[in-house]
Amino acid sequence: MATKWGICSAGKISNDFVVALSTLPAVDHQVVAIAARDLEKAKNFAQNHNIPKAYGSYEELAKDPDIDVIYVGAIHPVHRDVVLMCLQNGKNILCEKPLAMNAAQVQELIATARKFNVFLMEAFWSRFFPVYEEIRALLSQKAIGDVKFIRAEFGVEIYKVPRAVEKELGGGALLDIGCYCVQFVTMVFNGERPESVTAKGFLHETGVDESMSLILQYSGKRQAVLSSTIMATLPNQAAICGTKGIIQIPSDMWSPTSIIVNGKERKFDIPHTTKPMNFSNGTGMSYEAEHVRQCLLKGLKESPIMSLADSEMVASIMDEALQQLGVTYP
């Protein structure tokens, strides 16, 4: 039986997610409905991707009995309300990062998912890439000894994009792209809470963070330094440094196709498509989609790889950082 997907929002990320699904066997994954707040947009999206049903409201999607799981690709300020409504209608959910605007909202969504006994996962697609699987394997084998230091950065010049700077649209570097660095550290340190979070950065004229660096201090004198910006393109690398070696992601740390372990590089292929995509390596979203399918087949209510506890931890670290910079959202 195929996993039947409903798609919430007809934006760029939803396009790439549906294209990524098309690289998987059609006997396993089917998109049965798309919803947008503009029915015409939904109809156009449906036509482009051969989706049978198009809705002009998210509520209709939440109530559709044919759907097994909903992918929420809407902008982050609406995540809480949309996910809440879908969960209350008994729908399993894969929601784009950040899961919500703050840790309190994340906790509310987790509690609701448990109350209605449905699956919920934050779509940190990075964690399901072969490179990330390899990193987890290397860490569990203690291949680089004890981890002492982590560095990660994600910066792209998107300050002219309204979504990246407008407060009402959930703009700012940390929530949009810096979150990938926070989840990276959270994965490496197995969801451990840092002993301290120190944030330094600059605010945009709109009041969101345009550039930010975080220092996270962990027990046992372990440290992580994370940087994110919407003002310039960074090398976008990551490194995990241990007592016996180093693991490096040379580029695109959020969607990597290669890894360097103690100076030796290994490359990994990702699914190929001829269809137009908006984001680099976007077909890699197929990994998280297949993971969700496997979780549902096993009757799981959360992912063992991207746990709800990790989502809560990432949100609480970002809360602390934004508070230190004086960023508040409506």
Curated annotation (Swiss-Prot):
Top enzyme category: oxidoreductase
One Pfam family cited in the UniProt record for this chain: GFO_IDH_MocA_C3
Q: Where is this site: May play an important role in coenzyme binding?
A: Y71, H79, K97
One GO molecular-function entry: trans-1,2-dihydrobenzene-1,2-diol dehydrogenase activity
Q: What is its EC number?
A: 1.3.1.20, 1.1.1.179
Q: Where is this site: May play an important role for the adaptation of the alcohol substrate into the binding site?
A: D176
Top-level division of the source organism's lineage: Eukaryota
The positions annotated as site (May play an important role in catalytic activity) read Y180
What reaction does this catalyse?
(1R,2R)-1,2-dihydrobenzene-1,2-diol + NADP(+) = catechol + NADPH + H(+); D-xylose + NADP(+) = D-xylono-1,5-lactone + NADPH + H(+)
- Give the protein family: Belongs to the Gfo/Idh/MocA family.
Report quaternary structure and partners. Answer: Homodimer.
**Which PANTHER family does the entry mention?**
OXIDOREDUCTASES, TRANS-1,2-DIHYDROBENZENE-1,2-DIOL DEHYDROGENASE
Protein name listed in UniProt: Trans-1,2-dihydrobenzene-1,2-diol dehydrogenase
Lineage, top ranks: Eukaryota, Metazoa, Chordata, Craniata, Vertebrata
